[in-house]
Amino acid sequence: MDDIYKAAVEQLTEEQKNEFKAAFDIFVLGAEDGCISTKELGKVMRMLGQNPTPEELQEMIDEVDEDGSGTVDFDQFLVMMVRCMKDDSKGKTEEELSDLFRMFDKNADGYIDLEELKIMLQATGETITEDDIEELMKDGNKNNDGRIDYDEFLQFMKGVE
């Protein structure tokens, strides 16, 4: 598994991991190897509020199912959920945006600094340059203090819609 994805998975809250584990376990019941089939994966992700297209789902599966077993273990599933969570914020409630802010704010200091932003953006799997990351920070950091607070984050995310 790519280190960038591992870093992003580490930023998930225990609550998020527990929610993902509960959904995963529903589909793994009766499976001796503790894995779910790739066919069941779309159902699990939809149950968790994600709605990947069949193409996106296949792309994610291809990335994590390196041995071609047709199954995904929980660690691989977490990586897929992190990738899927990168979707834009259209229609997101303030509660969902608050959860997203906390996911970015790895050290829980109430701010997103450049390094936290970089880790999360790289975890999306998209090609992104240092200049792109710095530009996003500049766009989100309205008071020019070098970090994005919650209000700036909300304002920025509302502008993305």
Swiss-Prot record:
Gene Ontology molecular function terms on file: calcium ion binding
Positions annotated to bind Ca(2+) 1: 65, 67, 69, 71
Binding site residues for Ca(2+) 2: 105, 107, 109, 111, 116
Family annotation (Pfam families): EF-hand_7 (PF13499), EF-hand_8 (PF13833)
Residue span, EF-hand domain: 16-51, 52-87, 92-127, 128-161
Function: Troponin is the central regulatory protein of striated muscle contraction. Tn consists of three components: Tn-I which is the inhibitor of actomyosin ATPase, Tn-T which contains the binding site for tropomyosin and Tn-C. The binding of calcium to Tn-C abolishes the inhibitory action of Tn on actin filaments.
Record-given protein name: Troponin C, slow skeletal and cardiac muscles
